[in-house]
Amino acid sequence: MKRKFTKTVLNAVFVLGLCSIMGGTSYAWDGKKDGTGTHALIAEHGLTMLNNDLNQNEPKPIKQNIEILNKYLKDLKLGSTFPDYDPNAYDLFQDHFFDPDTGNNFTLDNKWYVASPIYDTAETQVRKFATLAENEWKKGNYKEATFLLGQGMHYLGDLNTPYHAANVTAVDSPGHVKYETFVENRKENYALNTAGNDTTQGIYKDAVANKDFDQWMTQNSVKYAKKAKALYYSHSTMKHNWDDWDYSGREAIKNSQVCTAGFLYRFINEVSEDQISGNNLTNEFNVVLKTADNEYAGTDDNVYFGFETKDGSKYEWNLDNAGNDFEKNQTDNYILKVKNDVKVNTNDITKYWVRKENRTPISDDWELSNIKLISNGKVILQKDINKVFSGNQVYDINK
């Protein structure tokens, strides 16, 4: 959102300068707009592994949902490359990075980065897209669900990339692009078709051990990102030789495929069971808002999201990411953390609201299409709004 003009201009100049250095891309595993490249290979072979490893005694709903996923393989692959071409993406793809030891992307960990920090990471994006995918799947929107799931698999692939797990960008080292180009040219040599065991063992058994989907996703991402980060320091820097890079690439792509196969198995289990998460306490939410695709739908005014609990406590957040928020036809995502790590019971929420506040005496109207709120790996609020906000206005959403 264009709030603080001087700060925004400085951020823009800084980011444009970095784009010229980094080539305007995070690079990571390669992916083409048409659903080909390394990311697509990882997604496809992850599903192939699951099909080949599927125990024949799996429940009927598991088998049926895997068949649906097979039917929409093309959408899975398209989703797996889309984040690199999303017109609403961060200019430096900051959310494609995740250091498992700090929990941050490079905007918080690398001292040379002086623009506004980005709090989305590859880990948070995996959880967001998988949750949105599960929500659409359970409504029968399989094509959209699979495309969203593919986007989650993109970020899962990114955190398996050694340079991304170590928060080493093209600014930090020319090896970033060189290494990933090296791997792209050899990706077919690293392809797998099985995890080496069926779905009653190994990665598949591990994938369903923790019944809390949201917790498991974080644990899974941290586990594999640690492997990727270790590979960076042991075999992937500019100090290492071609044999080291070949070993690193083989291990990293193997981990990406194995990780994907396990994740797809867990996802299929989630959508095959009528279960409700028992964890209703949280200090973090993820709100996703879609601005309408109409002329003048966007706004530069301040936008807030909040809710009230049955004890009268009110919580509200100013929705402001780096760059421009609430542009025409743009989907904006915000990680909302409750102050002082206070845990909120989502069952106690009685109402939600969206509030627009003028920044100048003249209102900059805004048309909101829809909103979704994520908590603990579940969509707990989804509503089509389709409303124009004028002036200082509050829109209440009853639970």
From Swiss-Prot:
<feature type="binding site">
    <location>
        <position position="29"/>
    </location>
    <ligand>
        <name>Zn(2+) 1</name>
    </ligand>
</feature>
<feature type="region of interest" description="Linker">
    <location>
        <begin position="275"/>
        <end position="282"/>
    </location>
</feature>
<feature type="binding site">
    <location>
        <position position="84"/>
    </location>
    <ligand>
        <name>Zn(2+) 3</name>
    </ligand>
</feature>
<feature type="signal peptide">
    <location>
        <begin position="1"/>
        <end position="28"/>
    </location>
</feature>
<dbReference type="InterPro" id="IPR008947">
    <property type="entry name" value="PLipase_C/P1_nuclease_dom_sf"/>
</dbReference>
<keyword id="KW-0800">Toxin</keyword>
<feature type="binding site">
    <location>
        <position position="176"/>
    </location>
    <ligand>
        <name>Zn(2+) 2</name>
    </ligand>
</feature>
<keyword id="KW-0862">Zinc</keyword>
<dbReference type="InterPro" id="IPR036392">
    <property type="entry name" value="PLAT/LH2_dom_sf"/>
</dbReference>
<feature type="binding site">
    <location>
        <position position="154"/>
    </location>
    <ligand>
        <name>Zn(2+) 3</name>
    </ligand>
</feature>
<feature type="binding site">
    <location>
        <position position="39"/>
    </location>
    <ligand>
        <name>Zn(2+) 1</name>
    </ligand>
</feature>
<feature type="binding site">
    <location>
        <position position="298"/>
    </location>
    <ligand>
        <name>Ca(2+) 1</name>
    </ligand>
</feature>
<keyword id="KW-0378">Hydrolase</keyword>
<keyword id="KW-0732">Signal</keyword>
<feature type="binding site">
    <location>
        <position position="364"/>
    </location>
    <ligand>
        <name>Ca(2+) 1</name>
    </ligand>
</feature>
<feature type="binding site">
    <location>
        <position position="158"/>
    </location>
    <ligand>
        <name>Zn(2+) 1</name>
    </ligand>
</feature>
<feature type="binding site">
    <location>
        <position position="320"/>
    </location>
    <ligand>
        <name>Ca(2+) 2</name>
    </ligand>
</feature>
<protein>
    <recommendedName>
        <fullName>Phospholipase C</fullName>
        <ecNumber>3.1.4.3</ecNumber>
    </recommendedName>
</protein>
<feature type="domain" description="Zn-dependent PLC">
    <location>
        <begin position="29"/>
        <end position="278"/>
    </location>
</feature>
<feature type="binding site">
    <location>
        <position position="180"/>
    </location>
    <ligand>
        <name>Zn(2+) 2</name>
    </ligand>
</feature>
<feature type="binding site">
    <location>
        <position position="96"/>
    </location>
    <ligand>
        <name>Zn(2+) 3</name>
    </ligand>
</feature>
<dbReference type="InterPro" id="IPR029002">
    <property type="entry name" value="PLPC/GPLD1"/>
</dbReference>
<feature type="domain" description="PLAT">
    <location>
        <begin position="283"/>
        <end position="399"/>
    </location>
</feature>
<dbReference type="GO" id="GO:0008270">
    <property type="term" value="F:zinc ion binding"/>
</dbReference>
<keyword id="KW-0843">Virulence</keyword>
<feature type="binding site">
    <location>
        <position position="321"/>
    </location>
    <ligand>
        <name>Ca(2+) 2</name>
    </ligand>
</feature>
<dbReference type="GO" id="GO:0005576">
    <property type="term" value="C:extracellular region"/>
</dbReference>
<keyword id="KW-0106">Calcium</keyword>
<keyword id="KW-0204">Cytolysis</keyword>
<feature type="binding site">
    <location>
        <position position="299"/>
    </location>
    <ligand>
        <name>Ca(2+) 3</name>
    </ligand>
</feature>
<feature type="binding site">
    <location>
        <position position="323"/>
    </location>
    <ligand>
        <name>Ca(2+) 2</name>
    </ligand>
</feature>
<feature type="binding site">
    <location>
        <position position="164"/>
    </location>
    <ligand>
        <name>Zn(2+) 2</name>
    </ligand>
</feature>
<feature type="binding site">
    <location>
        <position position="324"/>
    </location>
    <ligand>
        <name>Ca(2+) 3</name>
    </ligand>
</feature>
<dbReference type="GO" id="GO:0090729">
    <property type="term" value="F:toxin activity"/>
</dbReference>
<dbReference type="GO" id="GO:0034480">
    <property type="term" value="F:phosphatidylcholine phospholipase C activity"/>
</dbReference>
<feature type="binding site">
    <location>
        <position position="300"/>
    </location>
    <ligand>
        <name>Ca(2+) 3</name>
    </ligand>
</feature>
<keyword id="KW-0354">Hemolysis</keyword>
<keyword id="KW-0964">Secreted</keyword>
<keyword id="KW-0479">Metal-binding</keyword>
<feature type="binding site">
    <location>
        <position position="158"/>
    </location>
    <ligand>
        <name>Zn(2+) 3</name>
    </ligand>
</feature>
<dbReference type="Pfam" id="PF00882">
    <property type="entry name" value="Zn_dep_PLPC"/>
</dbReference>
<dbReference type="InterPro" id="IPR001531">
    <property type="entry name" value="Zn_PLipaseC"/>
</dbReference>
